């Protein structure tokens, strides 16, 4: 009997850390101050004006926000400034403090570039291009340290720190405009020297994070999650190679950060396959979806059309959100979900004089035509609830769940009352519509 009790206690000790992991949900709101200052009009689902969007997000159950940081966005190309590149340190300190003062956690997203950093472009900041590799590593450390010191002094200490944005292929490849053959990418076929240079830069970034913000968790962010849309990622080859390289280089980090946009990354099943591999290969790491999105109106051009399952509509976006959350909640190591550019809202702006970007973004959580919050916004908080919305819960939904939500018979919560005929669960009862 004693051995059985001891075994049970050991088993509980093994699972309790996973079960007790705190979850975080919110979005990247890096342009929110610009929208507010320029006069964007925000409304809730019922059409009531939102005086303070950040407070509204908190009321909707969100508990964390993400903000990007560029080294010197004044040196970004004009086209990219028109896409929303403006987040210098002063801007980020102010927004970061607002987030912290609202009682939310802050994820700071270092881009280590003057403009967008992603798999297609990771250009060295203009003021750093003349440095050799050793000097560049030192600059990365000192810049990271100095930024974090200023953030702390301003009352905007980050809780999560991304040391690079979508750095699947490395970062700081070289000067913008340099010949392609002179850029130091980290592809599957790249020379080992490129990977060594990259991990040395990353080591200095993470070192500064530990020195200045020892309580913050470090995020390594990639986006190789598709086996159908990303040709170097068959059987998740690029994803596997990346984190194996990080292990070999002994990179210090806590969280695996991923991006997922169906129009670029394919089906949700592909994302889940990536998560399954990562949680098995790196059980000591947390996993966060640090960028996600899907359209509620007007499609975004990409390589994959998911409208056969999720139409471009408020309900389609809501159903996508419900299914994404249900999938993520099947994986205990997944502890974060952030919707990218959730604040985009053209309603109320004078397009000629007060526009924030030069084009609409159609996967935000506000309708650009009306300024109303989409249904998906209020669904995000479901990620924080323990348990999952699947078939196993139908009995609970039918017999005990006396709330105003609508569910399908397989346990999926709908963003609003169903518009198609069928059998649903509502207020604990089966209902025919």
Model-derived features: positions:
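Hydrophobic faces of well-ordered beta-strands that scaffold small-molecule active sites
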Residues: 25-29, 65-67, 106-110, 159-163, ...
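Boundary/entry segment of secreted carbohydrate-active catalytic domains
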Residues: 21-56
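Substrate-binding cleft and catalytic face of glycoside hydrolase catalytic domains
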Residues: 56-194, 199-225
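Sec-dependent N-terminal signal peptides
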Residues: 4-14
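Aromatic-rich peripheral "rim/lid" segments of glycoside hydrolase catalytic domains that contact
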Residues: 42, 180-181, 273, 277-284, ...
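C-terminal tail/sorting-segment detector
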Residues: 421-433
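Residue-level detector of functionally pivotal "anchor" positions at catalytic/ligand-binding pockets or at interdomain
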Residues: 387-410
